[in-house]
From Swiss-Prot:
Main location: cytoplasm
Gene Ontology cellular component list: P-body
Organism: Xenopus laevis (African clawed frog)
Name by which UniProt lists this protein: Enhancer of mRNA-decapping protein 3
DFDF domain: residues covered: 187-223
GO molecular function, one term: mRNA binding
Subcellular compartments: Cytoplasm, P-body
Superkingdom of this protein's organism: Eukaryota
Domain observations: The DFDF domain is unstructured by itself. It assumes a helical fold upon interaction with other proteins.
Pfam families linked: Edc3_linker (PF16598), FDF (PF09532), LSM14 (PF12701), YjeF_N (PF03853)
Length: 505
């Protein structure tokens, strides 16, 4: 009757040490109380040996998963009569009572092809391995896998091939044997066919219409009353605001906030787009006279213009990159060309402030028997600095300086252009190859001998010519009512600065 169980698929539980084995019954030895399984699986992993043999003492539980078709003619009563056959194998004794546990498993619904019968068997066993999937699940995966699928073998599952005749594997006594066994574990498995074609991610992604899916989701949410979520085009998204933006609607921007009674012939605009019209020299002079009458004296105006001009000059010299304690060995040098008038006094005030910032100042001022009081006062203050004063062009440096500040020209003293010292100073500035900054240059009708790169205007700009270079405007502190008194509707274009650039319109 033992031969009737050949070809059956069984599951043998050998306890926690040896694990669970599944396979097809290939031999049953009633005398030696052994059973052999062909094509065995250990804890769901296929063994590398073709056949394993178990003793009855090692078996804790035996389940019959499938009976071959020729054995289905036996009824359950017949199976009970043949209890001495393979269906009821004795298990290990428990608690020393000598009683043995007998278990019969129900037939599985899986249709697994039968194995060959009548194979010779030798007693052997494999080493324990970690528990995994059942034999039936593992077999179904193997059937459903494509031909080019490459199985990844577990290195622990291949340990049984090294000890075919032992239940518990023994370590090799030599070190070289251990290394060789490890190499066999890692590289000994035969490589199966590797798929040649790679997965087409781009082509697969092109088949997915995200916009249509999002639209379907939004439509479903609208019908369900759950509200809408913006996933589509940016036009459908609700407006977002930064932390410094106002969510309230503001009034329209007015760019022309300065209105003059008579245009000077040219208009400028700031970086923010505000329009700054130019005024005539007569209106500019009237504005300064009214401001002086209200308390903005010449000394205050000289101080404000000197501070603004020095700030602009420090920026042109390089700012903090040039003026820092690490660059004491390369202090910038500035040449001041000043005339004997109020505009020259503005340049002297600028030189005094620059000298306080460790800038080497060379002041050129021609000798006059009598000078204006503002010029004398500013010159006395300048002499208290480390700046150098010269009265001859020959004493000016021959090598290029970092910056030249021009305050030679004046509308009231046009005759100074014919003086020899003036012509010599103009020739020196044009040949020094240093950039030139004009402070409060005269109106465009006055011919300027020095070609400037920048020009700084006070209060409101004049209509300057092309030789003035880029135009800048500084605030000298004229009150708004003073502008209104001379007929100018004024709104400050400076923002948070004292000096701003102007662009021609």
């Amino acid at each position: 009757m033992a031969a009737d169980w050949l070809g059956s698929i069984v599951s043998i539980n050998c306890g926690n040490t040896l694990g669970v084995y599944q396979g097809c019954v290939s031999a049953v030895d009633r005398i030696n109380q052994t059973i052999s399984l062909s094509q065995p699986f250990h804890n769901g992993v296929k063994c590398l040996v073709p056949e394993v043999t178990f003793r009855a003492g090692d078996i804790s539980e035996l389940k019959i998963l499938e009976i071959p078709s020729e054995s289905l003619k036996y009824t359950s009563d017949q199976l009970n009569d043949h209890s001495t056959g393979f269906g009821y194998l004795p298990t290990r004794q428990q608690n020393g009572t000598g009683k043995q546990k007998q278990t019969v498993a129900h037939n599985s619904a899986q249709n697994i092809p039968g194995q060959e019968e009548g194979k010779a068997s030798e007693p052997s066993s494999t080493s324990p391995q970690p528990c995994s999937k059942s034999f039936v699940d593992r077999h179904n995966e193997a059937v459903n896998q494509p031909k080019n699928f490459r199985r990844r073998h577990n290195s622990l599952g291949s340990s049984s091939s090294r000890y075919p005749n032992q239940v518990t594997p023994k370590k090799s006594g030599t070190k070289n044997g251990q290394l060789k066994a490890r190499d066999d574990e890692c590289f000994g498995d035969e490589l199966e066919e590797i798929p040649d074609t790679d997965f087409d991610f781009e082509g697969n992604l092109a088949l997915f219409d995200k916009a249509a899916v999002f639209e379907e989701i939004d439509t479903h949410e609208r019908r369900g009353g759950g509200g809408t979520r913006s996933r589509g085009t940016p036009n459908e998204r609700p407006p977002t605001y930064r932390h410094d933006e106002n969510i309230l609607e503001s009034e329209p921007i007015v760019y022309r906030k300065i209105v003059v009674p008579q245009s000077g012939g040219q208009e400028y605009c700031t970086d923010s787009g505000l329009v700054v019209p130019s005024i005539s020299y007569v209106l500019h002079k009237k504005l300064l006279c009214v401001a002086e009458k209200h308390g903005l004296s010449v000394e205050r105006r000289l101080e404000m213009s000197g501070v603004c001009a020095s700030q602009m000059a420090l920026t042109l010299l390089g700012g903090p990159n040039r003026l820092n304690p690490k660059n004491v060995h390369q202090r910038p040098t500035v040449a001041l060309l000043c005339g004997p008038h109020v505009k020259g006094a503005q340049g002297i005030s600028c030189g005094r402030h620059l000298a306080n910032y460790d800038v080497d100042i060379i002041l050129f001022l021609p000798n006059f028997v009598k000078m204006l009081e503002p010029v004398t006062n500013e010159l006395n203050l300048f002499c208290q600095t480390q700046g150098k004063q010269v009265s001859s062009v020959k004493d000016l440096p021959e090598c290029p300086v970092d910056l030249v500040i021009n305050c030679l020209d004046c509308n009231e003293n046009a005759f100074l252009c014919d003086q020899p010292w003036y012509r010599a100073a103009v020739d020196w500035a044009n040949h020094n190859r240093a950039p030139v900054l004009n402070i409060d240059p005269p109106v465009g009708d006055h011919v300027q001998g020095i070609h400037a790169k920048w020009s700084l205007e006070l209060g409101l700009p004049l209509a300057l010519g092309e030789q003035a270079g880029r135009i800048y405007l500084c605030d000298i502190g004229i009150p708004q009512k003073v502008f209104r008194e001379v007929g100018i509707s004024y709104h400050s274009p400076f923002g948070c600065k004292f000096v701003i650039p102007l662009h021609s319109m």
